A protein has these predicted regions:
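Tandem CBS (Bateman) regulatory domains
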Residues: 1-10, 49-86, 93-102, 122-179, ...
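Short acidic-hydrophobic, aromatic-tinged amphipathic segments that line or gate anion-handling sites
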Residues: 14-15, 88-89
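Short, basic/aromatic recognition patches
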Residues: 18-25, 98
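A glycine-centered beta-loop-beta connector
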Residues: 27, 35-51, 101, 109-124
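Short acidic/polar active-site loop segments enriched in Thr and Asp
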Residues: 33, 107, 168
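Short proline/glycine- and acidic-rich turn/helix-capping motifs at secondary-structure junctions
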Residues: 43, 176-183, 212-221
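Conserved short beta-strand edge segments in small beta-sheet-based binding/regulatory domains
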Residues: 170-172, 199-219
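Short basic, glycine-rich beta-strand/loop surfaces that mediate nucleic-acid
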Residues: 183-191
Length: 221
């Protein structure tokens, strides 16, 4: 999965001369929290709702309401925007984007292709992608298998047993657990009755520690 597959394409933008009040209005009217700042087709910054809040004078200020309104009415985006934001290319792998976001504590990325802003990827886009990838909105069953040795043969057996029951795998997550020196797999299967599959997993020697049917309305078991 690439960033181009999950980003919001052709996002709204403002230029650096845009008044802060106008940028705030755009965010409110379009229910968005971030705006790339583009001058003459080139990305020069990013402005967020948090930036707007920080730009607002403190309630403890000695300025009058008239003076406050005057200052805000003259303030421009270029005065409070974050300059030179970290960008990603459309073909950046999702995992790489997630790693960069965690390391740099970034909640969103402008997506730039050949110098042009073509999209934006935010926390909401990431959550939507993970929801789809994990099959959370689809009804089915969840099965957890622990104590695996990380062998390819284990994975082959799990898939083979699932196929024998003509059941679709909605998602499969494999996690290493260094503290226990083993691996754990969490399966989401397109079946309302996981018991026969669990029985065959156990016959094959797998340690099934959890199984249940879940509803898509809650996204959980």
């Amino acid at each position: 999965m690439r960033i181009r597959d999950m980003m919001t394409k052709n996002p709204m933008t403002v230029d650096s001369e845009t008044l802060v009040l106008d940028a705030q209005k755009i965010m409110e009217e379009n229910n968005i929290r971030r705006l790339p700042v583009v001058d003459k087709g080139k990305l020069v910054g990013m402005i967020t709702k948090h930036d707007l809040l920080e730009a607002s004078p403190s309630p403890a200020t000695s300025l009058s309401i008239h003076e406050l309104n005057y200052l805000l009415s003259k303030m421009k985006v270029k005065e409070i925007m974050k300059k030179n934001p970290v960008t990603l290319a459309p073909d950046t792998p999702f995992e790489e984007a997630l790693r960069i976001g965690q390391e740099k504590k970034i909640g969103s990325f402008p997506i730039v292709d050949k110098g042009k802003v073509v999209g934006i990827a935010t926390e909401s886009d990431i959550v939507r992608f993970l929801t789809r990838a994990l099959g959370i909105r689809e009804e089915g069953s969840r099965i957890t298998i622990e104590g695996l040795g990380g062998k390819l043969t284990d994975l082959e057996k799990i898939i083979s047993i699932t196929n024998q029951h003509q059941t679709i795998i909605l998602s499969m997550i494999s996690m290493s657990r260094p503290e226990k020196k083993d691996w754990m797999i969490v399966l989401r299967l397109n079946t309302s009755n996981p018991d026969p599959i669990v029985k065959d997993f156990k016959k094959a020697g797998f340690n099934v520690t959890y199984s249940a049917w879940f509803r898509c309305e809650t996204g959980s078991v």
